[in-house]
Design a protein with these regions (language model features):
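Rhodanese-like catalytic fold shared by cysteine-dependent sulfurtransferases
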Residues: 1-18, 26-60, 66-102
Length: 102
């Protein structure tokens, strides 16, 4: 499901069983990422599918990438695997919240 930034952030903050997933590359993640996010690179399809198969289906997953395209694809795959995944429309380039840099 696609959510705008306001709803994505609000729903994530109100959800006690949520995890933020960044589906960009390691290099992009190192340049800056949303606080408390974990990296699962969708550009590594085998590793991505293995990683999502190990995720807890009781949690909600708030997913983002640079502009929202890769995260949209990731959410589709995650939803097909029985996970509740929410795409950040516009991605990190439109994010107005805090960014953590490595």
């Amino acid at each position: 499901m696609d959510l705008n930034q306001t709803d994505w952030k609000k729903n994530n903050e109100e959800d006690n069983e949520s995890i933020i997933i960044d589906v960009r590359t390691q290099e992009e993640y190192n340049l800056g990422h949303i606080k408390k996010s974990i990296l699962i690179d969708i550009n590594q399809p085998d590793l991505f599918m293995e990683s999502i198969s190990n995720l807890d289906k009781n949690y909600s997953y708030y997913v983002y990438c640079r502009t929202g395209n890769r995260s949209d694809m990731a959410c589709s795959l995650m939803n097909q695997n029985g996970l509740k995944a929410y795409n950040l429309v516009g991605g990190i380039v439109e994010w107005k919240g805090d960014i953590k840099k490595n």
